[in-house]
């Protein structure tokens, strides 16, 4: 195949982006060639053609984002190669360059994204220590986490629902195994070595300004270099890195996030969905971060609660504020798109409309006395008002983006175009009078431009200055010097309007970039106001109460599960009291009685308090916990080759390793994944260890042997769920009371579940027979458990 200059250009650029699908702009299409074309054709279900024996597939340039989304979702990295000059102005081969590389984590366009964060994560490791840098390119947020605990790193990656992992080669296989559905890319070690990238990106004189470890600085440098590579930009929209540290935040393992249903996942209803009554995308993202990272500093928690309380106490102003916030747009992402030259005119309109709300919002905020005044960049607002149409149509260059009155030169060219039709009508009338041809017509098409059309019957009347341009079946088309001059002016006006609109739009965007710092500050303040006002709204709507903090006391009166109560009628409230003297609660009772719901609600109430939220209870006095741990449910880990019991023991090992006397531990049926005797033995030994450690523990179990702990340890208290029997009917009251369950009611639960009557009746027969045999053998009449006692009474 003969290689043309165009194909030489393509091959040269493709060589630089071997690992990407290259979409190569050719006129009105983006074309893919060779193997890329085959992939594009298959994924997008479009026709595969050929150009000079090279497989080729193309997509219209105006529909790029629609097709791009499908390619990225299919797991491909895509390099966009654009024409860098107008074809009409280039007599040689048009200059083309890659303008961005699109991956799941480098997307900034609105139509690709939901309101939630879109994190990529750079993961590095040195000598058993792990560092993860999370980045949402669409908002500029950067988070840094460092730990010697591999599982803690994996938990955070899972909690953040990352869309992309970037790592050195030696970590790829293990990360790919743990996160098989996440796009994972390896980068060379030199990405981690250029620490000057950090200094340049943040304009730092001293790289130690951020107080990050050498490992974290290397990972941050790798992130910056990668974002530069994908965005094809030297100036990045990255916020200063925020360190996720146990000194400031509670670290939640992925099991706890899942077991307490904190955020959207596989378990349906969750705490975030219940609390998320935010009015802005920024507020929703911040609220989710608060839920994933509760505070551990009592002063900071109480400051949030104070703000929420002020809002709750002034419902009229709260409603007014939330109404104003409902008109706020996603400033954070707009700023990012402007910074990376990906913004559209409607972004600037949305930015202006948001900023115009600030003066009125400041008036409302002043009534509460707990919020600082929002910055108001009046000059920028004035520029946006004058420059951008209120309802812009199309892209810059199409003549309907820049307002009239902003540029006198642009207005002149627009006037010329707007009066063109009128001028043509005048010209047409003049030519009819001059020639005497009443059916003479002036028209336009894209091939020949402007023309005068005369029927063949009138050809004898045409003047000498008419120059033939085209012959049709029944007519001829002509041009005159005057019409040619008019056409030149019109075409020049169209071209100049396109140039001017693009230039003016770019200049307005440059002005927005100059205000980036203040706009991001406004965005952060709006997010915080929205999140706090949402917590106040939740408190009012759901009848929550303000929690009070204590050194060691956990007292909840009339506690409710914040998620379950939203979808259940007549939810039963429950109380709990724990302190350093009584800090370990064993809860027995049948299935379906509400044991799991109860211990989860204690965890959720504690967590909600530490994000600064009011809580679902009549009264709540709580300690500030450093961690909340959970071991609940039965699940295996097929990808990791772990059985249900091994998963359970791994999670318990983590709890025993990490918990302190400031931790809350919630256990549900620990030990049931093995034989009864082994299970009870393990559960008892774990309980002893946690009692000695001083954690506050709620342990829901079917092992009645564990109720004997109360006789050996004064810190233990037994609770059960009250069950009422009316004839053959069993009523689960869901009420937690002191005591020990005397029956499991397993057969009754099976009956409620719809097991056939013949099976239920047979089960009763077997139960009765075993009961009689056990009574004869042991001389006891406890129908709850037929297990052999392992510990002295």
Curated annotation (Swiss-Prot):
ATP binds at residues 589-596. PROSITE patterns: DNA_MISMATCH_REPAIR_2. Keywords: ATP-binding, DNA damage, DNA repair, DNA-binding, Nucleotide-binding. GO terms for cellular component: cytosol. GO terms for molecular function: ATP binding; ATP-dependent DNA damage sensor activity; damaged DNA binding; mismatched DNA binding. It comes from the Bacteria. This protein is involved in the repair of mismatches in DNA. It is possible that it carries out the mismatch recognition step. This protein has a weak ATPase activity. NCBIfam families: mutS1, PRK05399.1. Belongs to the DNA mismatch repair MutS family. PANTHER family: DNA MISMATCH REPAIR PROTEIN MSH1, MITOCHONDRIAL, DNA MISMATCH REPAIR PROTEIN MUTS FAMILY MEMBER. This is DNA mismatch repair protein MutS. It comes from Thermotoga maritima (strain ATCC 43589 / DSM 3109 / JCM 10099 / NBRC 100826 / MSB8). The lineage of its organism: Bacteria, Thermotogati, Thermotogota, Thermotogae, Thermotogales. The gene is mutS.
